[in-house]
């Protein structure tokens, strides 16, 4: 699998893949992961390659542009990525406890434009299995007033919640779905 990651990095498809971003998520081969938002092409490509054919890769796209980008990435890297069209304020077409990991790609700070970001995170909580993890990837230096993802994740039901790391201009915030 590392061979595939290195090959994708060398080919220069889209943005240069940062293995740190992929490894910080903790996604493992064979896992079922859902990425919310599709702003960082290299993150999605790396995560899809990491879970491999024995895992499941899916993207929850808020709009047609994100859906097209995710489908394009899937074709370019030869990965099976299920693109889910989601609408804010509506139930998502995703089964309960369907995923081991949710990655929120907020590198373009799209959460600022959402009317109800807490509902998005509650849907993510519902989509995770008990013991599943969520990770939010967001810029350290925000163009907009920063969103307190630790607070939002806690309000959505994730416990514990922590800043996992800040590196290369990105902040990684992690939460766990517990059913206590």
What feature does the model see in each segment?
Residues 3-19, 38, 144:
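Conserved SAM-binding loop and adjacent beta-strand
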Residues 11-31, 42-46, 50:
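Conserved alpha-helix/loop element of class I SAM-dependent methyltransferases that forms part
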Residues 28, 89-103:
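A short acidic, Gly/Pro-enriched loop at the edge of an enzyme's catalytic core
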Residues 34-35, 39-91:
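Class I SAM-dependent methyltransferase SAM/SAH-binding core
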Residues 48-49, 116-130:
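A short glycine-rich, Lys/Arg-flanked "PGG" loop and its adjoining helix->strand segment in the class I
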Residues 100-115:
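A short SAM/SAH-binding and catalytic strip from SAM-dependent methyltransferases
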Residues 131-139:
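Conserved beta-strand signature within the Rossmann-like core of class I S-adenosyl-L-methionine
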Residues 156-180:
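Core SAM-dependent methyltransferase catalytic element
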């Amino acid at each position: 699998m590392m061979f595939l990651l290195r090959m994708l990095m060398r080919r220069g498809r889209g943005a240069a893949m940062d293995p740190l971003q992929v490894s910080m998520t903790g996604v493992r081969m064979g896992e079922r992961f859902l990425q919310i938002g599709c702003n960082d092409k290299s993150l999605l490509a790396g995560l899809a390659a990491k879970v491999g054919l024995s895992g499941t890769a899916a993207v929850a796209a808020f709009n047609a542009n994100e859906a097209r980008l995710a489908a394009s990435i899937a074709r370019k890297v030869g990965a099976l990525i299920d693109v889910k069209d989601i609408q804010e304020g509506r139930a998502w077409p995703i089964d309960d406890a369907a995923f081991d990991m949710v990655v929120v790609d907020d590198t373009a700070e799209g959460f600022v434009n959402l009317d109800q970001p807490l509902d998005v995170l509650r849907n993510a909580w519902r989509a995770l299995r008990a013991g599943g993890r969520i990770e939010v990837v967001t810029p350290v230096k925000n163009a907009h007033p920063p969103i307190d993802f630790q607070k939002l994740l806690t309000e959505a039901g994730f416990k514990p919640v922590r800043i996992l790391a800040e590196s290369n201009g990105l902040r990684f915030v992690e939460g766990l779905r517990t059913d206590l």
